[in-house]
């Protein structure tokens, strides 16, 4: 739901290097020292994962009991300070994990006004209920992040030019697994996430028109209108105010059929829902002093509140089987993912329905049990379709 751009109807160019609009999650809001594990899924992923094109990266932050850690780092491009600890409340009450960090980075040290300064505070709680019967794992994480030193200036900037970037947000995650071990279901996994932030980018810059005095159009509908002319040089003040809200929920069930120690089959089925909306004031500037002007099209102020929310509902089912063939092993995995993107009628088009079948095969020929040279030699192949839905940035462009 990040829409921090000058115009969604033109190139979608971001306001400056601070924005990741249309590019996915801003990894700068995640503390690297608070990461517990990182899984890279290459090739054709499971149908459990959707809205992607080539693989996925699964990041899990720390939880449970961890020793006290204090870290300091400095190099020409970045500075970082981190402190964190996880402690056990009690055997019944579970464990708590607390951490905080500060980070400063420059993609280009020659452009200090494009630097990034942020603080992050993380709070995590984990516990396992009903340990002796049907264990239910519960992991809750709450993160707060905020930019500091948001107002930037630099001797390289022209006189009276200013840059200001503000980003403050809260991220809540809840996930776990319930081992039911019944005749029809082995385990039930759940995941829920809410991410809300307030982003505000302000810039004052000098606009110089190479074509000299230029007419500007500011109407929202086609037709003939009286307009005005811009001078060849002027200062433009513009602000992009965004309040993106992203909600994600997933529920999946697993059933394990164990035929022998090395022969089994696992069935997986689940449902997933995503909701994306932006309630910011959007692009704000004086129409008589626009930040971008050309002979073809000019941009206009637009509130993000006028952009409808996106709802995506998905279902998936998958079967994975491992079959021993003498001293070799054949693993087959196949499934399908069905997704429907609900589009508002104002977009002038119907909902988007996506079908994503995926198949993977791995035949392990050599291993430590049948030879003394190779630890692992396998033939891997597969076929799959992955669909990535358009974001709010591109689905509802301004007129």
Outline where the language-model segments fall:
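Short acidic/polar hinge/loop motifs at secondary-structure boundaries
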Residues: 2-41
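Transmembrane beta-barrel wall of Gram-negative outer-membrane proteins
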Residues: 69-104, 111-193
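Structural signature of Gram-negative outer-membrane beta-barrels, strongest in the C-terminal barrel
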Residues: 303-399
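Face-selective signature of the C-terminal outer-membrane beta-barrel domain
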Residues: 129-145, 165-348
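N-terminal periplasmic accessory domains that precede
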Residues: 1, 24-28, 48-72, 87
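Outer-membrane beta-barrel translocator domains and adjoining extracellular loop/strand segments
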Residues: 84, 108-115, 147-159, 200-211, ...
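Extracytoplasmic loops and strand-loop junctions of Gram-negative outer membrane beta-barrel proteins
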Residues: 19-23, 40-41, 65-68, 104-109, ...
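Transmembrane beta-strands of outer-membrane beta-barrel pores
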Residues: 74-78, 102-106, 142-148, 194-202, ...
């Amino acid at each position: 739901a990040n829409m921090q751009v000058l115009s969604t109807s033109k190139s979608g160019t971001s306001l400056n290097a601070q924005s990741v609009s249309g590019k996915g999650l801003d990894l700068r809001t995640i503390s690297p020292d608070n990461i517990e594990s990182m899984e890279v899924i290459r090739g054709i992923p499971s149908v459990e994962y959707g809205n992607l094109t080539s693989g996925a990266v699964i990041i899990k932050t720390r939880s449970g009991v961890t020793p006290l850690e204090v870290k300091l780092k400095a190099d020409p491009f970045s500075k970082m300070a981190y402190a964190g600890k996880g402690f056990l409340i009690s055997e019944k009450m579970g464990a708590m994990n607390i951490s905080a960090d500060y980070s400063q980075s420059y993609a280009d040290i020659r452009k200090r006004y494009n630097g990034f300064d942020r603080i992050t505070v993380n709070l995590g709680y984990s516990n396992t209920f009903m340990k002796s019967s049907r264990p239910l794992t519960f992991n809750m994480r709450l993160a707060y992040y905020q930019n500091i030193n948001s107002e930037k200036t630099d001797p390289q900037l022209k006189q009276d030019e200013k840059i200001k970037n503000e980003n403050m947000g809260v991220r809540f995650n809840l996930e776990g697994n319930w081992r039911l071990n019944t005749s029809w279901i082995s385990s039930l996994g759940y995941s829920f996430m809410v991410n809300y932030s307030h982003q505000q980018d302000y810039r004052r810059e000098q606009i110089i028109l190479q074509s000299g005095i230029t007419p500007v159009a500011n109407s929202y509908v086609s037709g003939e209108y009286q307009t005005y002319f811009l001078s060849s040089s002027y200062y433009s003040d513009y602000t992009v105010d965004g309040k993106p809200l992203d909600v994600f929920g997933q529920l999946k069930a697993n059933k394990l059929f164990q035929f022998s120690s090395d022969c089994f089959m696992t069935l997986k089925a689940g449902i997933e829902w995503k909701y994306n909306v932006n309630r910011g004031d959007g692009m704000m500037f004086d129409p008589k002093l626009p930040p971008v002007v050309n002979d073809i099209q000019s941009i206009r102020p637009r509130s993000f509140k006028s952009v409808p929310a996106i709802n995506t509902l998905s279902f998936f089912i998958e079967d994975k089987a491992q079959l021993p063939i003498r001293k070799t092993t054949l693993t087959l995995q196949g499934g399908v993912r069905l997704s429907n993107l609900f589009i508002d009628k104002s977009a002038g088009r119907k909902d988007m329905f996506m079908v994503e079948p995926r198949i993977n095969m791995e035949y392990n020929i050599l291993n430590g049990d049948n030879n003394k040279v190779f630890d692992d030699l396998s033939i891997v192949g597969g076929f799959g379709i992955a669909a990535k839905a358009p974001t709010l940035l591109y689905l509802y462009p301004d007129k």
